Amino acid sequence: MAPKKVLLALTSYNDVFYSDGAKTGVFVVEALHPFNTFRKEGFEVDFVSETGKFGWDEHSLAKDFLNGQDETDFKNKDSDFNKTLAKIKTPKEVNADDYQIFFASAGHGTLFDYPKAKDLQDIASEIYANGGVVAAVCHGPAIFDGLTDKKTGRPLIEGKSITGFTDVGETILGVDSILKAKNLATVEDVAKKYGAKYLAPVGPWDDYSITDGRLVTGVNPASAHSTAVRSIDALKN
């Protein structure tokens, strides 16, 4: 029996975003933690982005977010994580039938490109239609902005419960005004737009993830591992 496979999506957006001039992009642990979780459970993992390129969110490289074994894995060019990243694919190089889980990692960069990432959305929709799981963490649910259920033609999240980075969190980070200026939808905006029920954690930094059938979402970097675990459980069930 062929090993189960996960398609782990990254944002292609990597440009100045924060008020201090730092770039946003992929939030490291939101890709690293799911990757390591899936690999530990025996899954093969491929990385994909809409353009086949990616860059790191510079704030996610700070010691507060990247330390210990995570930092070791990230800096080791021979780590399983980095070797797999080096083979990142474009959607055109991917066959949705090969994968059982689509996992959208995050970083504020996703708010820029996921809603327009039609090829990534098509693959996610196909994996879901095939009976697979679609998961997203933190700002990853931006992928649901325009993502349809192939079987119904309706928005994938319509009538479902999701979570994701909170509007309160955006305010605490001081980026709410930046999002408004750039006309970027928050995860809560996306939920409202498509008729999903948004469930918030008690605190914006809590480890909090939820499952609604084969749809799995998590709220922040601390939830990346639990979101991956829930994805595996949803596939088993």
Swiss-Prot record:
The modification Cysteine sulfinic acid (-SO2H) is found at residue 138. Its EC number is 4.2.1.130. InterPro entries: Class_I_gatase-like (IPR029062), DJ-1/PfpI (IPR002818), Prot/Nucl_acid_deglycase (IPR050325). Cys-138 is easily oxidized to sulfinic acid. The active site is at residues 138-139, 170. It comes from the Eukaryota. It is found in: Cytoplasm, P-body. GO terms for biological process: cellular response to nutrient levels; cellular response to oxidative stress; chaperone-mediated protein folding; methylglyoxal catabolic process to D-lactate via S-lactoyl-glutathione. No protease activity could be detected. Present with 358 molecules/cell in log phase SD medium. Belongs to the peptidase C56 family. HSP31-like subfamily. Homodimer. This is Glutathione-independent glyoxalase HSP31. It comes from Saccharomyces cerevisiae (strain ATCC 204508 / S288c) (Baker's yeast). The lineage of its organism: Eukaryota, Fungi, Dikarya, Ascomycota, Saccharomycotina.
